[in-house]
């Protein structure tokens, strides 16, 4: 049983969903970034989703672009990122670690080299934000060869065919993209998410974790109620780093409070 399977089985027993925060490695600097990842896990994060800083993050909003800039300014390189992941992995042998990256970064030293480094550092999954399923073969084959789950996005507008492909090709978990989480009053996860989940289950997809615009406990609760296996929170986590970057103590306290309240909301 791999780390994701073990996690979902454990959460099912406890009747909980997964809370997965996203941060960019090296934001605001490599040393503090390690403390941040440690703090997130200690405060209740079930898994981590991590970005490797990149100068042109297409799919990211301004908050995560800011994280990339801070990390690059503090001289964070992919090599430093893999070192930090390996350090977290040795301290937390059971916590699933996923990467969210862009194809250019994977191509930089060759696809195989990238996945070999992931394997060595103890990464469990890789989501390449700008590679759709129909262009994923080369990445997927290398990932699987190195024991890494390829993660795919199921967008709200996906056709049944797309969902079936995502279900068939993905492993670890399915990243369910929800536009349902952007504004307060209208975020009732409602039909679209429930329908998508139903479809994904029909196709026997890996457990679906809802991401995009998840910033408060009520949304996590909604995601889990709608049948998602958990929720990913990126911008909201990164915003706390942005706000408190000058004061590490306040920063780690804010992340602890945020993570524990989001995790508490995963109880069914």
Curated annotation (Swiss-Prot):
Gene3D superfamilies: Aldolase class I. Its EC number is 4.2.1.20. One of its GO terms (molecular function) is tryptophan synthase activity. Disulfide bonds: none annotated. SUPFAM superfamilies: Ribulose-phoshate binding barrel (SSF51366). It catalyses: (1S,2R)-1-C-(indol-3-yl)glycerol 3-phosphate + L-serine = D-glyceraldehyde 3-phosphate + L-tryptophan + H2O. Pathway: Amino-acid biosynthesis; L-tryptophan biosynthesis; L-tryptophan from chorismate: step 5/5. The active site is at residues 49, 60. InterPro entries: Aldolase_TIM (IPR013785), RibuloseP-bd_barrel (IPR011060), Trp_synthase_alpha_AS (IPR018204), Trp_synthase_suA (IPR002028). One of its GO terms (cellular component) is cytosol. It comes from the Bacteria. Keywords: Amino-acid biosynthesis, Aromatic amino acid biosynthesis, Lyase, Tryptophan biosynthesis. The keyword Flavoprotein does not apply. Belongs to the TrpA family. The alpha subunit is responsible for the aldol cleavage of indoleglycerol phosphate to indole and glyceraldehyde 3-phosphate. Tetramer of two alpha and two beta chains. PANTHER family: TRYPTOPHAN SYNTHASE ALPHA CHAIN, CHLOROPLASTIC, TRYPTOPHAN SYNTHASE, ALPHA CHAIN. This is Tryptophan synthase alpha chain.
